[in-house]
């Protein structure tokens, strides 16, 4: 980013908050191309000339696109021409895909500069443990025992393109860029309706930015109203406040009214509320009564329908009681389990029993989802019976064994915090037997004959690595006992979900 800040055009555009001139600068296309090569999934960038050609940047394609943008009439193709000239439609769709890639890069520039300036002069201590996914579960163990309800809200998608344009208008002040974005978005969808394919080249970065902008707008309003929820008692709203003047009206919040929002919001101040967004869902955990949870549900329905103009059904908001229902979160099924505890107390000559109930977070492995993921990747059938991995039989024995051991260790580490180890052992059994069947199929032998020839030492690789790690953590006496296999262990070095865990 520092490399391109030296250009005078970029500095002038940054000072005036103008992004539109950047669409006509070739170095921005180089930046987008370079980012496309460095993506994690290593997909082919659309700035390449073709799939078979060496990965070189095509300046000719960029020059043609810039010339077309200088004459925007050449970018407009009537529907009649799309039906008559298919080649023309494919070319236009290709150009609009290029613009979407470029727009995703350009529109993130002011956000990155604003974020970098906010961190200037500040020192932050890096804590790598907090980056781990497993660091969330100890927090849940401490906090969820005090909660009783979870509100699970499915975030709806905007049904009209103009909603996305209006949301982006609050964050990008350049009118020319917004008009150009609206024009390209409509033309792109027009061409896509005629020529889109199931496996066509899309730009996930661009659509992810639009989706995050849509969700960020929703969350900013929700968080503000959440902090001011004590002021919302018995207030009926009439006029929708403009988002552009949103921050200016904070001090005059009592005068703000909402259009077509006649509901009386009696939301109470609750300091024990926690919010998280996961897999397109908003999860709200709190210690409220059923009446207040229904009010929150009614609030979400009206917020989406009245403010975002999205038809939102109340069935998409589920109120789950943690003591009865399971919460699917980060590959686990979490719920609250009541453990009765009896304590015998004796005072002088009198003895009596004290019955206590201990609330504990119960984390369970979703076996149906894991078996479905294993069956999808051909490790077993839909019933969970192991089968051979035929596609791996061309590899060497050591390569096949290392693949299965790596998958087994990753799943074992991720689900080491499960309160029911029996399901984890079943997953290990499926992978081990699948490994043996794959090796037996490669050597054209039966499983029994293959194990009889090589012995049981073949499967020791599945246990060696995990045993070494646990022996360093726990004392030898505790490690030798069977209690180790009943405790939950959270690893603080897991930074991403495994593909089998992230089955959605």
UniProtKB/Swiss-Prot annotation:
Subcellular location: Plastid, Chloroplast
GO CC terms of this entry: chloroplast
GO biological process, alphabetically ordered: mRNA processing; RNA splicing; tRNA processing
Domain of life (superkingdom): Eukaryota
InterPro entries documented for this protein: Domain_X, Maturase_MatK, Maturase_MatK_N
Record's keyword terms, sorted: Chloroplast, mRNA processing, Plastid, RNA-binding, tRNA processing
A molecular function GO annotation: RNA binding
Annotated S-S bridges: none
Pfam families linked to this entry: Intron_maturas2 (PF01348), MatK_N (PF01824)
Function: Usually encoded in the trnK tRNA gene intron. Probably assists in splicing its own and other chloroplast group II introns.
Family statement: Belongs to the intron maturase 2 family. MatK subfamily.
Name under which the protein is recorded: Maturase K
Recorded name of the encoding gene: matK
């Amino acid at each position: 980013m520092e490399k391109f800040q030296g250009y005078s055009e970029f500095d002038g555009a940054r000072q005036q908050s103008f992004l539109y001139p950047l669409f006509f600068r070739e170095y921005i296309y180089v930046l987008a191309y370079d980012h496309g090569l460095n993506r994690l999934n290593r997909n082919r960038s659309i700035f390449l000339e073709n799939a078979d050609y060496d990965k070189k940047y095509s300046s000719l394609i960029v020059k043609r696109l810039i010339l077309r943008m200088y004459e925007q009439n050449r970018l407009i193709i009537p529907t009649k021409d799309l039906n008559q000239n298919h080649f023309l439609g494919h070319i236009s769709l290709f150009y609009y895909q290029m613009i979407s890639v470029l727009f995703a890069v350009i529109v993130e520039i002011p956000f990155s500069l604003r974020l970098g300036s906010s961190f200037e002069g500040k020192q932050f201590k890096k804590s790598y443990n907090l980056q781990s996914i497993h660091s969330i579960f100890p927090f849940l163990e401490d906090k969820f025992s005090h909660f009783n309800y979870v509100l699970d809200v499915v975030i709806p998608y905007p049904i009209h393109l103009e909603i996305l344009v209006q949301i982006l208008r609050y964050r990008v002040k350049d009118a020319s860029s917004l008009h150009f974005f609206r024009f390209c978005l409509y033309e792109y969808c027009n061409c896509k309706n005629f020529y889109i394919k199931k496996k066509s080249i899309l730009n996930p970065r661009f659509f992810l930015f639009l989706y995050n902008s849509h969700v960020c707008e929703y969350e900013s309003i929700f968080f503000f109203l959440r902090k001011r929820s004590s002021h919302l008692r018995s207030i009926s709203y009439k006029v929708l406040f403009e988002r552009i003047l949103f921050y200016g009206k904070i001090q005059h919040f009592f005068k703000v009214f909402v259009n077509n929002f006649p509901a009386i919001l009696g939301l109470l101040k609750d300091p024990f509320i926690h919010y998280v967004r996961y897999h397109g869902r908003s999860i709200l955990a709190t210690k409220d009564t059923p009446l207040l949870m229904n009010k929150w549900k009614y609030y979400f329905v009206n917020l989406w329908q009245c403010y975002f103009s999205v038809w939102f059904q109340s069935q998409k908001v589920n109120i789950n009681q943690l003591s009865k229902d399971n919460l699917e979160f980060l590959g686990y099924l979490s719920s609250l389990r009541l453990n009765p505890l009896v304590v015998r107390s004796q005072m002088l000559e009198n003895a009596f029993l004290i019955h206590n109930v201990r609330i504990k977070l119960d984390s369970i492995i979703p076996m149906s989802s894991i078996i479905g993921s294993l069956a999808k990747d051909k490790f077993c059938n839909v019933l969970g019976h192991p089968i051979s991995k035929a596609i791996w039989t061309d590899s060497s024995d050591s390569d096949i064994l290392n693949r299965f051991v790596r998958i087994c260790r990753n799943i074992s580490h991720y689900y080491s915090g499960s309160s029911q180890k029996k399901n984890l052992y079943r997953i290990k059994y499926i992978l081990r037997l699948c490994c043996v069947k794959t090796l037996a199929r490669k050597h054209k032998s039966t499983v029994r004959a293959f194990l009889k020839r090589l012995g049981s030492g073949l499967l020791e690789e599945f246990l060696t690595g995990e045993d070494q790690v646990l022996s360093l953590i726990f004392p030898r006496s505790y490690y030798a006992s069977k209690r180790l296999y009943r405790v939950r262990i959270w690893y603080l070095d897991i930074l991403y979900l495994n593909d089998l865990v992230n089955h959605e």
